[in-house]
């Protein structure tokens, strides 16, 4: 097998505990491989009153952490349900790896694997790392 090449990591981020763990691992991988991180928070599942500016407030702390670590960072805020938004953003930004938390902020937090992570695993065209 050849060398692993990771230039862009797409992080699915919702502010949950598992998403924070995923963010830490994404940062570590980005530093190791010199990769950029695209922080993705799809908000199509949120109430109509939710605005992209509110989503930015959610993702800004993690973006600032990455920036302080010297990691090139972009933000993607697709207006799609989470799994589809992550998959669309991964394709749009040509991500080499998707990193997501195993369980998000959904109402079924006791499930073995969250529905978003499961759908991303099933349909992604690039490797997916699920963090718990």
Where are these regions (language model features)?
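Conserved beta-strand termini and adjacent loop/short-helix elements that scaffold enzyme active sites
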Residues: 40-42, 76-80, 131
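Small/aliphatic-rich secondary-structure junction motif
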Residues: 2-53, 58, 65, 71-74
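Proline-centered helix-kink/hinge sites
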Residues: 39, 82, 125-127
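Structural beta-alpha unit
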Residues: 1-4, 57, 67-98
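Gly/Ser-rich helix-loop-strand patches that form or flank binding pockets
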Residues: 89-132
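Conserved residues at beta->alpha junctions
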Residues: 13, 77, 102
